């Protein structure tokens, strides 16, 4: 019996030894089943790609944190290990497959798996290694997953690396067949740069999503433009600025981007940033909670939990105020005397056009408060009743005096026009922008990646194939003004106008007159709405061949989705 017992003991010991030193790591608990999304390139079209990104955003975004109606990712402290990752399964036409792991805290690719092996970036965390691909052989890469490290491995920047369906298919093949023993880090890093931008970055920015959708539709590759690369690089800082912005969207710091020609773009407010980037998801930053009347603020600044970390409130922001027809609000003649009126004037850098927005609700220039009385003027803040110096700036550009409920209005579009207070009718003459007072020239891309256009021979607004050629017989470039108007860039006296305020009313081009039916808001859900009618621009489904544009109730359909794009692809 002793001999038998000894033999059994040795057998058990040998089995245990094999388990410890086997090819695969052992884990005491069963692997966590993370949610997943899939994208198959075999017969994919742009709509399937769009739905894939929508599904991915839905699984990555947890909770209800929002800033200016944009979803904010949860901080690491609020995410359990069992909810930490989302898996993205990619398949190409050659039936090669790879699975990416996305961290829901950063929306970034942290590892990938193929067959029975998985690969983690250098410096991977314990949470990643203990929860991802635990039933595979895990291997470490000898470089990190940030852009600097990946570009160093490739030997050049991602500005030279094409994106599109062909590049994605090749990258899936490269990742699915990668072996660390081969040591082809250059090819691996290049493939990772492609999938990171076509998955993570496209989910973060609808601007990037649109460019990739167009490349899928046209079966053409493209290289990232400098605006696209700069928004990728600045996602963290722009997320922070948005979450700490004042209620009207003014930033404390400038977000510095680049245009396609490498010219700097200084962005000082949320409205302009969204028009440029169509950012769809924000990285978590400590939130500032500001309570404002619901009837004034349409988009909440931040909705967070009670135990969220709080940012220090930005006490003051000094910016110009842009308004009707591109004029700026200024203290008349730069006169500092109490009672000096506020007027419209050509925008400049003079001190009497600089306005300081404070958290106490005051707006000051030349050391005096913007004050409501029989007219709009500046006055000693300590002399007049406090309620006459309080203002609320809405994200749609309305500036309201809460006591009276009246709003700043520019009765005429002319130099020297005195600013008045009037009942809010959501008119373009009542639209303002804090900072970024210069119009943004852009294409407006909508249904099936077609561009909003007008023909100089009539006043119709329709959709057409996007063209960057100056010889085109139609106008597809638009100037987005701070007063909320959308103007024909070749003739900025002409505005996009709804014929009425009811559903199915056509949208046309008329002379800019500061009307309510000439004011528009680019919303974070992708719609362009008219604040007065609360209806949105809609491609008439009954008239798609003619591509007629009408007003309609919001429905969430693709023919109500628009994006401002300085590059129409």
Curated annotation (Swiss-Prot):
Disulfide bonds join 286-311, 328-347, 369-381, 451-466, 495-512. GO terms for biological process: defense response; negative regulation of translation. InterPro entries: Ribosome-inact_prot_sf (IPR036041), Ribosome_inactivat_1/2 (IPR017989), Ribosome_inactivat_prot (IPR001574), Ribosome_inactivat_prot_CS (IPR017988), Ribosome_inactivat_prot_sub1 (IPR016138), Ribosome_inactivat_prot_sub2 (IPR016139), Ricin_B-like_lectins (IPR035992), Ricin_B_lectin (IPR000772). It catalyses: Endohydrolysis of the N-glycosidic bond at one specific adenosine on the 28S rRNA. 2-alpha repeats lie at residues 448-488. Keywords: Disulfide bond, Glycoprotein, Glycosidase, Hydrolase, Lectin, Plant defense, Protein synthesis inhibitor, Repeat, Signal, Toxin. The active site is at 201. GO terms for molecular function: carbohydrate binding; rRNA N-glycosylase activity; toxin activity. 1-alpha repeats lie at residues 325-365. CDD domains: beta-trefoil_Ricin_ebulin-like_rpt1 (cd23483), beta-trefoil_Ricin_ebulin-like_rpt2 (cd23490). It is an enzyme of class 3 (hydrolase). 2-beta repeats lie at residues 492-530. Residues 315-435, 437-565 form the Ricin B-type lectin domain. Its EC number is 3.2.2.22. Residues 1-28 form the signal peptide. Coiled coil: none annotated. SUPFAM superfamilies: Ribosome inactivating proteins (RIP), Ricin B-like lectins. 2-gamma repeats lie at residues 533-566. It comes from the Eukaryota. Glycans are attached at residue 40. In the N-terminal section; belongs to the ribosome-inactivating protein family. Type 2 RIP subfamily. Disulfide-linked dimer of A and B chains. The B chain is composed of two domains, each domain consists of 3 homologous subdomains (alpha, beta, gamma). This is Ribosome-inactivating protein SNAI'. It comes from Sambucus nigra (European elder).
């Amino acid at each position: 019996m002793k001999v038998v017992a000894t033999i059994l003991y040795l057998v058990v010991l040998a089995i245990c030894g094999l388990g410890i030193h086997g090819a695969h790591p052992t884990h005491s608990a069963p692997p966590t089943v993370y949610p997943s999304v899939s994208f198959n390139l075999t017969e994919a079209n742009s709509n399937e790609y769009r739905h894939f990104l929508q599904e991915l955003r839905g699984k990555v975004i947890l909770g209800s944190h929002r800033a200016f109606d944009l979803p904010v990712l949860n901080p690491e402290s609020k995410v359990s290990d069992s909810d930490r990752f989302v898996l993205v399964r990619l398949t190409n036409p050659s039936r090669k497959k790879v699975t990416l792991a996305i961290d829901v805290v950063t929306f970034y690719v942290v590892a990938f798996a193929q067959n029975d092996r998985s690969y983690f970036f250098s410096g991977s965390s314990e949470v990643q290694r203990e929860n991802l691909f635990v039933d595979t052989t895990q291997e470490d890469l000898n470089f990190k997953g940030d852009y600097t490290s990946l570009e160093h491995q490739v030997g050049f920047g991602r500005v030279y690396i094409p994106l599109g369906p062909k590049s994605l298919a090749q990258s899936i093949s490269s990742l699915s067949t990668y072996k660390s023993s081969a040591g082809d880090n250059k090819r691996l890093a290049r493939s990772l740069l492609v999938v990171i931008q076509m998955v993570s970055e496209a989910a973060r920015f609808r601007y990037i999503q649109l460019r990739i959708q167009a490349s899928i539709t046209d079966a053409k590759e493209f290289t990232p433009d400098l605006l696209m690369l700069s928004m990728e690089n600045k996602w963290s800082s722009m997320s922070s600025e948005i979450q700490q912005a004042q209620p009207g969207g003014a930033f404390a710091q400038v977000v510095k981007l680049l245009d396609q020609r490498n010219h700097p773009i200084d962005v000082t407010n949320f409205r302009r940033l969204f028009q440029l980037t169509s950012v769809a998801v924000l990285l978590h930053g400590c939130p500032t909670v500001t309570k404002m009347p619901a009837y004034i603020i349409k988009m909440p600044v931040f909705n967070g939990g009670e135990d969220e970390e709080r940012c220090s409130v930005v006490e003051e922001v000094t910016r110009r105020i842009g308004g009707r027809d591109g004029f700026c609000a200024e203290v008349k003649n730069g006169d500092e005397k109490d009672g000096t009126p506020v007027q419209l004037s050509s925008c400049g850098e003079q001190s009497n056009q600089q306005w300081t927005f404070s958290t106490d609700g005051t707006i000051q220039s030349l050391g005096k408060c913007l004050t409501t009385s029989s007219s709009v003027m500046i006055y000693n803040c300590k002399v007049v009743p406090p309620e006459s110096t309080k203002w609320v700036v809405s994200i749609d550009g309305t500036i309201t005096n809460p006591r009276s409920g009246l709003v700043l209005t520019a009765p005429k579009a002319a130099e020297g026009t005195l600013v008045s207070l009037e009942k809010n009718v959501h008119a373009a003459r009542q639209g303002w922008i804090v900072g970024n007072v210069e119009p943004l020239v852009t294409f407006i891309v909508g249904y099936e990646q077609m561009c909003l256009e007008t023909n100089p021979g009539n006043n119709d607004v329709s959709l057409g194939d996007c063209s960057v050629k100056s010889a085109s017989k139609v106008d597809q470039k638009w100037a987005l003004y701070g007063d909320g108007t959308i103007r024909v860039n070749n003739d900025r006296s002409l505005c996009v106008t709804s014929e009425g305020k009811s559903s199915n009313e056509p949208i046309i081009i008329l002379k800019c007159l500061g009307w309510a039916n000439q004011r528009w808001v680019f919303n974070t859900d992708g719609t362009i709405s008219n604040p007065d009618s609360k209806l949105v621009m809609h491609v008439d489904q009954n008239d798609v061949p003619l591509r007629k544009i009408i007003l309609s109730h919001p429905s969430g359909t693709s023919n109500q989705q628009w994006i401002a794009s300085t590059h129409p692809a």
